[in-house]
Amino acid sequence: MATGPRYKVPMRRRREARTDYHQRLRLLKSGKPRLVARKSNKHVRAQLVTLGPNGDDTLASAHSSDLAEYGWEAPTGNMPSAYLTGLLAGLRAQEAGVEEAVLDIGLNSPTPGSKVFAIQEGAIDAGLDIPHNDDVLADWQRTRGAHIAEYDEQLEEPLYSGDFDAADLPEHFDELRETLLDGDIEL
């Protein structure tokens, strides 16, 4: 490790590869709440966060495991569940009085058509005003999960174990999306 009077130890969260402080500062300067989109292999999370005097304050959040409360039976780490998680977070943000936000993807790569942009698309469809480029959003059929259903039809054995059939994923997605957008449920 480097030593000497000119060596500067990076901040802890930068050393752990958890925070890009230059990007964070640019997002905070906008003065708008941040739509924090985080993904893992099994789940996705969407939070609307503002800067507070004692750290960040969460105004609204949704986790892909929350979708089970509304009837989601498919796995929670795919594109359709990312979109629905963003939609749910956007609806909860609307209830909290948030109207606009900026997307914070953290250290995730800004790959067009990825799950973080599916979260953004869901929040936009919920009514949030988020500046974006339409080129980064995935094709609607991919967001619905049609690519998963097509892959399942090619397999000899079912893609998912259990009662859920992956061939029904686009229809299941449409049903839950309509349920969330109708507003007949408690968020």
UniProtKB/Swiss-Prot annotation:
Biological process, per Gene Ontology: ribosomal large subunit assembly; translation
Example of a GO cellular component annotation carried by this entry: cytosolic large ribosomal subunit
Keywords from the named record: Ribonucleoprotein, Ribosomal protein, RNA-binding, rRNA-binding
A family per Pfam: Ribosomal_L5e
Disulfide bonds: none
Keyword Cell inner membrane applies: no
Keyword Ribosomal protein part of the UniProt annotation: yes
A GO molecular-function annotation: 5S rRNA binding
Assembly: Part of the 50S ribosomal subunit. Interacts with proteins L5 and L21e, and attaches the 5S rRNA to the 23S rRNA. Has been cross-linked to L21e.
Matching HAMAP family: Ribosomal_uL18_A
PANTHER family: LARGE RIBOSOMAL SUBUNIT PROTEIN UL18, RIBOSOMAL PROTEIN L5-RELATED
UniProt family annotation: Belongs to the universal ribosomal protein uL18 family.
Role of this protein: This is one of 5 proteins that mediate the attachment of the 5S rRNA onto the large ribosomal subunit, where it forms part of the central protuberance and stabilizes the orientation of adjacent RNA domains.
Protein name per the record: Large ribosomal subunit protein uL18
Source organism of this protein record: Haloarcula marismortui (strain ATCC 43049 / DSM 3752 / JCM 8966 / VKM B-1809)
Species classification: Archaea, Methanobacteriati, Methanobacteriota, Stenosarchaea group, Halobacteria
